[in-house]
Amino acid sequence: MAVSFTITYKDESTGARLGLLYTPHGTVETPVFMPVGTQATVKTMTPEEVRDIGGRMILSNTYHLYLRPGHELIREAGGLHRFMHWDGPILTDSGGFQVFSLGPLRKVSEEGVAFRSHIDGSEHFFSPEKAMEVQMALGSDIAMAFDECAPYPCSREYALAATERTTRWARRCRTAHDREDQGLFGIVQGGTFKDLRERSARELVELDFPGYAIGGLSVGEPKQLMYEVLDYTVPLLPEEKPRYLMGVGSPDCLVEGVLRGIDMFDCVLPTRIARNGTALTRQGRLVVRNAEYARDFSPLEPDCDCYACRNYTRAYIRHLIKANEILGIRLTTIHNLYFIMKLMEEIRAAVRQGRMLQFRDDFLRKYQGD
């Protein structure tokens, strides 16, 4: 099997666990956060820098790479790892979320989704088979099944149709996927409806994927509602297989997700807010572009050991961002990803020492300013 998973420790008082995810490009300790490299790059950072701050596995985006430069070109280059010079594991999403986010630019049928490119308006069609073809050409370590991500809020009727279609498409993905050095994960849908989540999980578990994602969350619903959905969805998934919460990456959600038994996360949040001049700190978000930091000669976070905090001040980084200098974005990106990687390291240590609940309380008290 291309991808396998071993649980190395289970916390007795919570759902948290530690594990090892084995892939063709190396073994990763879980829980793990995957920085997002949408266009085959973690924005502004070299692969070496991503590795230096603790990144071990990244996510790349099937929809974007299919449109530009094209999956055949990447296959010709020797696959995504060689193309982007990243030798660690890569997970590719299926493109489903992006295609369904296109709104009026897309048309859904049982066969798949017809859509217009957001780049040049050209017409395309994604089916489960096409999503598999593209991801097999990219050569990621883990591919994702093509699913229908229902928006929030949505009617029960819509969520039911999307859940049923997700199962049918998952079967077609299973049939079409035949790359032996690539694992294929299924995605549980069902919106915020408990019975639909149960049904989706049951049907996907029957298909026996090597790992399972929980999709359709972090799409605008309140965090408390997301935690409730996790509380009743995670126990439905096979304990011995990795569980991946898609698109979730704010520090508080990472802590709460691990407590509930999630092993894998990805999110654009740390890199996206960095480009808006916002830094993650233990005390919450710091909007360094604000005028109050113009004469602040302290680092983004005083106790942080990242390259940005060791060498530069808030005043300087603010100046760079206000002047639209790329270095400003690079420094906030380096800091934010370092912050998340350090957090994951601390979470793993807390789980190992059986103090995850205490860690959650201490972390959130500072982070949320309670």
From Swiss-Prot:
Q: Which residues bind Zn(2+)?
A: C304, C306, C309, H335
Named in its record, the pathway it takes part in is:
tRNA modification; tRNA-queuosine biosynthesis
Q: Which cofactor does it need?
A: Zn(2+)
Instruction: Identify the keywords attached in UniProt to this record, alphabetized.
Output: Glycosyltransferase, Metal-binding, Queuosine biosynthesis, Transferase, tRNA processing, Zinc
EC id: 2.4.2.29
Instruction: Quote the cofactor binding remark.
Output: Binds 1 zinc ion per subunit.
* HAMAP family associated with the record: Q_tRNA_Tgt (MF_00168)
Function field = Catalyzes the base-exchange of a guanine (G) residue with the queuine precursor 7-aminomethyl-7-deazaguanine (PreQ1) at position 34 (anticodon wobble position) in tRNAs with GU(N) anticodons (tRNA-Asp, -Asn, -His and -Tyr). Catalysis occurs through a double-displacement mechanism. The nucleophile active site attacks the C1' of nucleotide 34 to detach the guanine base from the RNA, forming a covalent enzyme-RNA intermediate. The proton acceptor active site deprotonates the incoming PreQ1, allowing a nucleophilic attack on the C1' of the ribose to form the product.
Protein name, please?
Answer: Queuine tRNA-ribosyltransferase
